[in-house]
Amino acid sequence: MADDTGTEEGLGCSGWFCVEAIVDKTTENAISDDEDENVDDSGLDLVDFVDNSTVIHTKQVHAQALLNKQQAHADQEAVQALKRKLLGSPYESPVSDSQHSIDNELSPRLGGLTLCRGSQGAKRRLFQSLENRDSGYGYSEVEVQQTQVEHGHGAVHGTMGNGGAVGSELGVQENEEGSTTSTPTTRVVELLKCKNLHATLLGKFKELFGVSFGDLVRQFKSDKSSCTDWVIAAFGVNHSIAEGFNTLIKADSLYTHIQWLTCTWGMVLLMLIRFKCGKNRTTVSKGLSKLLNIPTNQLLIEPPRLQSVAAAIYWFRSGISNASIVTGDTPEWIQRQTILEHCFADAQFNLTEMVQWAYDNDITEDSDIAYEYAQRADRDSNAAAFLKSNCQAKYVKDCGVMCRHYKKAQMRRMSMGAWIKHRSAKIGDSGDWKPIVKFIRYQQIDFLAFMSAFKKFLHNIPKKSCLVLIGPPNTGKSQFGMSLINFLAGTVISFVNSHSHFWLQPLDSAKIAMLDDATPPCWTYLDIYLRNLLDGNPCSIDRKHKALTVVKCPPLLITSNTDIRTNDKWKYLYSRVSLFEFPNPFPLDTNGNPVYELNDKNWKSFFQRLWSSLEFQESEDEEDYGETGQTFRCVPGTVVRTV
């Protein structure tokens, strides 16, 4: 083996070493003086040789945009450094939700120690701001470090660590700008974060308008209750919609009172609207939600207080100011409580006026009196005073009792002819008497014999004052009798109540009576106990909570499927009744309507046509019956004093 060049043996050294010479390049260029071969090459100069950051291709690069980008990046790094400086205990879990305690503030290392292991599972948050929302892609404790900074209002915001700081500069800048601006979306999210949204809206309303919403409205528990007047408070309305809402609602309303104020949630509208027809809360909320472009849970909708003077004055005073837009006629409940003449018109309740009204309108039932008179409160001062009273039930009962007394006394003073005219005056003149006559002839009854018995029946002649209609079922006996009783405002008694001592009490206050569908036990009862009643003679009647009274039985009409002539045990009733048989079924047309109409108008025409045949005399002094003289008055007159 040949000797290698540069290797010397001896002097206690042996081995190989490399000798490198500095030579010129083949290009024969001199080596640069800047290169220092004595410095160790660590490769740091090749770190930025490959740029992994996102390259944004633009057509033209502006110097100002580049400067802004650099400044934003520098600001971001300064904020990141400040956040790291204010970070709590380094031993606290980054996913922990525990609050910083006083010990943690004094000693982060001591505050990080716990006796029990807390829950490491992250809680799901229903409402999360856009900047804190993360898709979760690639999330791990190693790759992403979540830091928390506690702001003055107590909210905790998370920021990203070192990862992604270089490649997402533009996205970080947009998130920083979005977190400082307040948009309608963020305001709605903040509103929805409230645990009790209704209470929050009520509190904001009182803060803005200086008056409680409950002081202006009365509560409807049901959303289906209808009302024409509604008070609405709308939150978060756009400014352009608020200004044009008066025009949008004009087509559906008769009166509008609109005022608005500005708050952090947008425009807040307070409205008093009278719609053209009654609407419930659900209908109003759906309609206004579409017009105002807001959800229904941002609306407070209740009817106004109609009897509150303070509420009426609020609407009146705010309506005359320049802060409200008012269109239409002012509701009467505001005028009644604010205008001076209406205040003077308020008077105490007068029972006689209520009784006079019930008498004139022929209303004798307590429930009808209470309902009808309460509806007159908006145009009758006495009815308004009635509603304000705490004794409404007593007044209604007293009014009904007095009205029935007056009606009963008026009826007793009238003869049968006057009573028929009195009843006919309340019915129209478009009737026809022929269907009644045709129906009687259809039942194979001699019309002259019927008119003779009917005349004695109406005149209440003894032993001729009971008219009996017998025959098979469905022959029109009850239809014929009920139509006559309804025209003459008679009463009906039922044998089913015969076990009571008071079942004949209605005969005391009737001009004519009817006993429908008398069965054999009923005929036996009449034969044993009520022979004098069928005679038309005075008899004693027991009345509930009253003493016995002696009355003359009014004309009594009886219908039955039993022919008393076929049984001798009722022979003592033969001479006390006038009996007519209806053998034929009641006729109906193809549509199921009666062929012969038996109604009030036809009965009126029947009595007018056959008035002379019934031998009702024309009274010369009809004033005794209240027909042509002055009408009955129970209200004391007022004396007109001359000045």
Curated annotation (Swiss-Prot):
Location of region: DNA-binding region: 180-346
Molecular functions per Gene Ontology: ATP binding; ATP hydrolysis activity; DNA binding; DNA helicase activity
Motif Nuclear export signal: chain residues: 106-115
Residues the record lists as Phosphoserine modifications: 89, 93, 107
Record PTM text: Phosphorylated.
InterPro entries given in the database record: Helicase_SF3_DNA-vir (IPR014015), P-loop_NTPase (IPR027417), PPV_DNA_helicase_E1_C (IPR001177), PPV_DNA_helicase_E1_N (IPR014000), PPV_E1_DBD (IPR046832), PPV_E1_DBD_sf (IPR046935), Rep_E1_papillomaV (IPR016393), Znf_lg_T-Ag_D1_dom_sf (IPR037102)
One Pfam short name: PPV_E1_C
Cross-link named Glycyl lysine isopeptide (Lys-Gly) (interchain with G-Cter in SUMO), sites: 552
Top-rank EC class of the record's enzyme: isomerase
Primary location group: host cell
GO cellular component: host cell nucleus
Function summary: ATP-dependent DNA 3'-5' helicase required for initiation of viral DNA replication. It forms a complex with the viral E2 protein. The E1-E2 complex binds to the replication origin which contains binding sites for both proteins. During the initial step, a dimer of E1 interacts with a dimer of protein E2 leading to a complex that binds the viral origin of replication with high specificity. Then, a second dimer of E1 displaces the E2 dimer in an ATP-dependent manner to form the E1 tetramer.
Subunit structure: Can form hexamers. Interacts with E2 protein; this interaction increases E1 DNA binding specificity. Interacts with host DNA polymerase subunit POLA2. Interacts with host single stranded DNA-binding protein RPA1. Interacts with host TOP1; this interaction stimulates the enzymatic activity of TOP1.
UniProt xrefs under HAMAP family: PPV_E1 (MF_04000)
Protein name, UniProt field: Replication protein E1
Native source organism of the sequence: Human papillomavirus 42
Gene of this entry: E1
